[in-house]
From Swiss-Prot:
Protein name: Andropin
Resulting phenotype, L58S: In strain: New Caledonia
Record's function text: Male-specific peptide with moderate activity against Gram-positive bacteria.
Signal peptide start-end: 1-23
Superkingdom field: Eukaryota
Coiled-coil ranges from the UniProt annotation: none
Induction notes from the record: In response to mating.
Family membership noted in the UniProt record: Belongs to the andropin family.
Subcellular location per the Swiss-Prot or TrEMBL entry: Secreted
UniProt note on tissues of expression: Ejaculatory duct of adult males.
Major subcellular location class: secreted
UniProt GO BP: defense response to Gram-positive bacterium; innate immune response; male-specific antibacterial humoral response
Record gene name: Anp
Amino acid sequence: MKYFVVLVVLALILAIAVGPSDAVFIDILDKMENAIHKAAQAGIGIAKPIENMILPKLTK
């Protein structure tokens, strides 16, 4: 979650500093944030089945 906050702050600083005409930087940051988010989702998707195989079911 920290990376998202950092990217939001950077996006706001750049939006204020460069103005709306140079919003390319904002688009790049948005694409980076989306890529990081998708990578995290993929990592969780891979780790969850492995975790379920390794850890015994404690509720049964």
